[in-house]
From Swiss-Prot:
Domain of life assignment: Viruses
Name of the molecule in the record: Microtubule-associated protein VP6
The protein's role, per its UniProt record: Minor inner capsid component. Displays NTPase and RNA 5'-triphosphatase (RTPase) activities. May function as a cofactor of polymerase VP2. Associates with microtubules and plays a role in the formation, structural organization and morphology of viral inclusions, where the assembly of cores and the replication of viral RNA occur.
GO cellular component labels: host cell cytoplasm; host cytoskeleton; viral inner capsid
Subunit structure: Interacts with VP2.
Subcellular location(s) per record: Virion; Host cytoplasm, Host cytoskeleton
Keywords: Capsid protein, Host cytoplasm, Host cytoskeleton, Inner capsid protein, Virion
Keyword S-adenosyl-L-methionine among UniProt keywords: no
Major site of localization recorded for this protein: virion
Length: 561
């Protein structure tokens, strides 16, 4: 019994590449033989489980969504029978009916509680009225279970996937505590097709590639038991017409799985775009569609990935679309709630990310899309905004904090104060080239980073007008600063100074930031040194989000203008 009814939610299972075998839906179709070793321990028609889902939903609806004594229901379904207790005085005809349905009936005194319903169960040993189940519910459930002839019960099947588990009905969640569910592993939303339950209930995918493209007869395939995963790079319609796959179901995956060359070996990346919209083919360079990859991609390998500006596509395969995590959507929804609320003076989102992650490029676009969706101006300050402003104003007695002026300083051709100080520190230690820096011992690097850290901290909260705390306060409260503001950060101590907000996230992107710094044309050794310094100080306790999750949160929000 799947935790989510496949008959009523077939579209959900199709997202996992799962299509029910025909005989599970229509009993008039003779089931195709499956090897005994491939069978699951207990196989029953999917219709039985669908009837149980309907019965459980009906019983829960009688009590505002709550199952009375979920343990009894769990035992009845997964064990095939249960022991129930009825109060003395229960009509003999009712007791006989329960016994006929395979229940062991034990009589118990009412203890002078005349209003108590007819029966309860031995799942509890006291007279807790919260656990008492009516005779009507017991009869309905036991009659249904008995009709299936299930002496061993049904196994509850759950996918190890966040989206799947978030959609499990409440009445099933109430049962799970009292069962030992069979967990089907998933990888990035793709179910483990070797699982015996999946093989018994669903068509098993067969992967067609350019190297094995041939007729189904050559592969000994049947449309009753197999679906087709088209990884040939050719359109489904062409494969069906030319190779005789007209009767087969082709799995529809709208995302991509791209394999790249990398400094340390092949790199796998999932992208929430179909290949036709992405515009990449084997041999294409990483930078060709960089923004699309940055906005919709996630690296699946351990960091550092080794992807760089020189990386090229090895192959592109169809893949299931990624779903935003519940944690990411929750924290982003909190920010969007502030954006639309008339009771919030300023809505500020603080975003930390590694230096070189591409956060400024992405967040500029995010701010534009949020502005269009919300119908209001959205401001954006890069993580270098303060350092660049300070470089121009450190000797100015009364500097301007006007938002537009700060933006005019916040450009790539303006050297940051921290870049200046990092360059001075590297020169002091005799470092002028990337190779020299990378050959330093760990102890030497850490010593230099600690010195740079002191420079960063010195500017945070000093009493000077030019301190970082004063800068962010003056800019964020300025009369020309947009009410909704996105502010980038570099390191953990900025939590205390960067902006007044209760919404802070840690952005993960596709970039290998070390490689990104090496690829930069301007002051590569300075950029890499700053990246390493900031990385050690990156706040890791904030909720991690990916660019595609931030964009998806805007799409899912119910905007009212």
């Amino acid at each position: 019994m799947f935790a989510i009814d496949p008959l009523k939610h077939s579209k959900l299972y199709e997202e996992y590449g799962l299509y029910l075998r025909p005989h599970q839906i229509n009993q008039e179709i003779k089931p195709t033989t499956i090897k005994k070793k491939e069978l699951a321990p207990t196989i029953r028609s999917i219709r039985y489980a669908s009837l149980l889902h309907s019965m459980l939903a009906k019983h829960a609806a009688r009590h505002n969504g709550t199952l009375i004594n979920p343990r009894m229901y769990a035992d009845m379904i997964t064990l095939g029978n249960t022991k129930v207790t009825v109060t003395k005085g229960t009509p003999k005809a009712q007791i006989d009916t329960l016994k006929m349905n395979g229940l062991t009936v034990v009589s118990k005194s009412r203890r002078n509680n005349k209003k108590k319903p007819v029966s309860d169960t031995t799942a509890t040993t006291d007279e807790n009225t919260n656990d008492i189940v009516t005779y009507k519910a017991l009869t309905e459930m036991s009659t249904l279970v008995e009709s299936f002839h299930l002496p061993s019960g049904l196994t509850l099947i759950v996918f190890d996937d966040e989206k799947y588990q978030s959609l499990i009905p409440d009445y099933i969640n109430q049962l799970i505590t009292y069962t030992q569910p069979h967990i089907i592993p998933t990888w990035q939303g793709i179910a483990d097709f070797s699982d015996p339950y999946l093989r018994s209930y669903f068509r098993r995918p067969f992967e067609l590639t350019a190297s094995n493209l041939a007729s189904p007869q050559k592969h000994n395939l049947s449309p009753l038991t197999r679906s087709i995963f088209n990884n040939t790079g050719r359109e489904d319609a062409i494969i069906k017409k030319l190779y005789g796959y007209g009767e087969y179901i082709f799995i529809k995956y709208e995302g991509c799985l791209i394999t790249w060359t990398g400094v340390y070996g092949a790199v796998a990346m999932m992208v929430n775009l179909p290949k036709r919209d992405l515009g990449l083919d084997a041999g294409d360079n990483f930078l060709k569609e960089y923004k699309q990859l940055l906005f919709y991609g996630v690296i699946t390998d351990a960091t550092p990935s080794g992807i760089s500006a020189k990386s090229t596509v090895i192959k592109i395969s169809p893949h299931k679309m990624m779903n935003p995590s519940g944690g990411a959507l929750a924290v982003l929804s909190k920010f969007l709630e502030a954006v639309v609320s008339a009771n919030v003076i300023n809505a500020t989102l603080v975003v930390y990310a590694e230096k070189g992650a591409g956060k400024t490029s992405f967040l500029s676009t995010y701010a534009e899309r949020l502005s269009v969706a919300s119908g209001q101006a959205v401001g954006h300050l890069s993580s270098d905004a303060y350092g660049r402003w300070l470089a121009k104003n450190k000797d100015v007695k009364e500097p301007s904090f006007e938002y537009d002026y700060v933006l005019s300083r916040d450009t790539d051709d303006t050297e940051s104060y921290y870049e200046q100080r990092a360059s001075e520190l590297l020169t002091l230690h005799g470092i002028s080239e990337l190779a020299q820096y990378e050959l330093l011992s760990v102890r030497k690097k850490v010593k230099m980073m600690n010195e740079m850290n002191e420079i960063l901290i010195a500017q945070l909260e000093n009493a000077d007008t030019h301190s970082e705390r004063n800068f962010y306060y003056m800019v964020s409260t300025g009369k020309n600063t947009p009410r909704t503001l996105i502010v980038e950060g570099h390191f953990n101590a900025q939590d205390a100074t960067i902006a007044r907000t209760d919404t802070t996230v840690l952005l993960r992107t596709i970039n290998d930031t070390t490689q990104a710094m090496r690829d930069r044309q301007r002051s590569g050794v300075v950029q890499l040194f700053l990246r390493d310094t900031y990385y050690r100080l990156l706040p890791s306790l904030h909720t991690t989000v990916y660019p595609f999750e931030m964009l998806e949160s805007i799409k899912r929000w119910k905007w009212v203008h």
